[in-house]
Amino acid sequence: MNYPIRIVRRRKLAVGFVAVAALAAAAGATLLSNTAQAASTLGAQAAASGRYFGTAVPASKLGDGTYVSILDREFNMITPENEMKWDTTEPSRGNFNFGPADQIVSHAQAHGQRMRGHTLVWHSQLPSWVSSITDANTLRSVMDNHITQEMTHYKGKIYAWDVVNEAFADGSTQHRSSVFQNVLGNGFIEEAFRTARGVDPAAKLCYNDYNIEDWNAAKTQGVYSMVKDFKSRGVPIDCVGFQSHFGSGGPPSNFQTTLSNFAALGVDVQLTELDIAQAGTTQYSNTV
């Protein structure tokens, strides 16, 4: 079935997402279904083919009746737009603010919508007190504590967490420069995932990035190699999120290959963002 998707953006990253099965049996994207609801909404259409359909939600819009009506009618998965990012949840060391995200989680629970946690470790929207840390032991303690406190607060309420977000450099198989990479080295991603699994064994743990749709791209290969290595060594990773930013030509011709190859590693593949720039109705329909 074809339907257009429009994702509203604010600040650096707002996530709307669809879980897709690269190969229906391989991807294993589970979903909320509502058998009493006709397949006339985005969420119901997705459910009919074993998928879910979600959107980014800012807490500030939950008081808008029109917005909420569309949200609750069309979507069965919710991602907080910015409310779970580090600069909001821990603006100063050890002082946590979960109020805005709590509003979104409460809404989702009241309306039978799953929640995606976004995001625990990211180089952007990071408070200056974190980005200025130069001691490895201090940063490791800070990172592990942040993951532990936030995941503990929402334990049992989050379907999947973006544990680490956008850690790879554009056009490269290597990690980007960040306080985590520069101070802790390559092992920070593994440590973040191991810490996360220890806090909430039931939540799916995801790595999320953009420009990893083209199978031949260096960045795609870098992420693939990391996931393959993690799976071979028992590092807990359950899913890979693809921030799918396409032009009028739609996705790369080998996008299906990319999804299939990641799914073959034993991880869910999820479209965590989807936008199609400068495209007409036909291009939207063909892509979606």
Label every model-predicted segment.
Residues N2-V20:
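N-terminal export and membrane-targeting signals
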Residues A39-E81:
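Boundary/entry segment of secreted carbohydrate-active catalytic domains
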Residues P58-E74, A101, R140-M151, A217-F230, ...:
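Short, acidic/polar
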